[in-house]
Regions:
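N-terminal secretory signal peptides that target proteins for export/translocation
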Residues: 1-16
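Bacterial N-terminal signal peptides
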Residues: 21-31
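Solvent-exposed N-terminal domain segments of exported/luminal and surface proteins
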Residues: 38-199
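Long, compositionally biased interface segments
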Residues: 38-40, 44-46, 271-363
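Short helix-loop boundary/capping segments
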Residues: 198-206, 216-270
Length: 363
């Protein structure tokens, strides 16, 4: 029988306990760090705010009573330059569009793009090469295919609720067409994919920063605008956003309260451990010890694909007469123009409907 000396036995026992101790400490540190995730109202630009942010009681979608920051933002931040959107003619250059039909990809709105759509059965221009442009979506369209360039309404205000401390959901919430994603630090709301031309027949043109005007008259993003040039470089698109670009800077807070960043982490590396929502736990400038946050990617739209946390009820309300967040959201009919499509195999939730829907507000 081999007898282990007492000092070696103690060392063996200590070594056996070490992994559990390290694991426990790691879990404790992770939980402590996660608790640091919070919305900081002072980060939002005063150029977008109608009044100072307020802390209010709110109810999350899962019934949790908590505290939210309430921000009342303008139709567009003071001094923000937007456009171009729809080009007046084929000789002009407009914004961008992520085409999801045949020859799919990210395109500049120019002659080559619209002539390509012509070959696919979508006709956005007349014989004189002027585009069909709609600026008022309350009116019935004359043409089957139109480029949407909605007029701004300076009177519109938007009220946004963000949980001050994020609460992780039991399951991530998928983000469909025109789903509410968050509020950029410049005060511009952020939404998921704009409605497809394949569904509506119309093209809601985006400018080169990935934004456009809602039917209600207010400007919003469909991309991480402060890192969108990464997309152009990746996909070979000749475009540039006039906003300062940064791979690492915080762009926004999602509606669940978690922060949103560019394509790289605080150390300048592209994260390799992103989850299905394009998020992960890792260090940020405000929390070097780590917090959960989302990252932009090199695919359009470079936004979260789902939300990890729980959002507040009534988290986006506008004073607009139509569009998202207003009492009136017009219905979406079958997409006019283009070749006939067989939608019999599409899930019922994807079928065009006459019922009001968020997606319909940007036909």
């Amino acid at each position: 029988m081999t007898i282990t000396p007492p000092h070696r036995a103690a060392a063996v026992r200590h070594k056996a306990r070490l992994p559990a101790a390290v694991l426990s400490a790691s879990v404790a540190m992770l939980m402590a760090a996660a608790a640091h995730a919070e919305v900081v109202p002072s980060q939002f630009s005063s150029a977008a705010l109608e009044k100072a942010p307020e802390t209010v009681s709110c109810t999350l979608e899962n019934g949790t009573q908590t505290q939210c920051t309430r921000l009342v933002v303008k139709y567009k931040p003071d001094g923000l330059k937007t456009g171009p959107f729809c080009p007046p003619s084929l000789d002009d250059e407009g914004g961008i569009w992520d085409w999801d039909g045949e020859n799919s990809g990210l395109y500049r709105l120019d002659r080559a793009f619209f002539e390509m759509l012509d070959t696919l059965g979508f006709h956005f221009h007349d014989d004189d090469e002027s585009l069909h442009i709609m600026t008022d979506l309350s009116k019935r369209p004359v043409e089957a295919n139109n480029c949407l360039n909605v007029a701004e309404d300076e009177s519109v205000e938007m009220t946004v609720l963000l949980p001050l401390e994020p609460v992780e959901a039991d399951e991530p919430t998928p983000l469909g067409t025109v789903a509410k994603i968050g509020l950029a630090l410049d005060g511009v709301p952020i939404f998921a994919d704009a409605p497809s031309v394949l569904d509506t027949g119309n093209l809601p043109a985006l400018d080169t920063c990935g934004g456009h005007v809602d039917p209600g008259g207010w400007y919003h993003w469909h991309a991480t605008a402060t890192d969108i040039d990464t997309l152009y470089d990746e996909h070979g698109v000749d475009a540039h956003c006039q906003l300062p670009q940064s791979h690492t800077a915080q762009f926004a807070y999602a509606f669940d309260g978690y922060p949103m960043f560019g394509t790289q982490d605080s150390g300048g590396s592209v994260p390799t451990d992103l989850d299905s929502c394009n998020g992960h736990f890792g260090p940020t400038e405000r929390h070097p010890e780590g917090e959960y946050h989302y990252h932009a990617t090199d695919e359009f739209p470079n936004l979260p694909k789902c939300l990890k946390g729980v959002v507040a009820k009534d988290n986006f309300v506008t004073t607009a007469s139509m569009g998202i967040g207003s009492p009136r959201i017009p219905g979406q009919g079958p997409g006019p123009g283009g070749p006939e499509k067989d939608t019999s195999d599409r899930p019922e939730s994807d079928q065009p409907s006459e019922a009001p829907s968020q997606a319909s507000s940007e036909q």
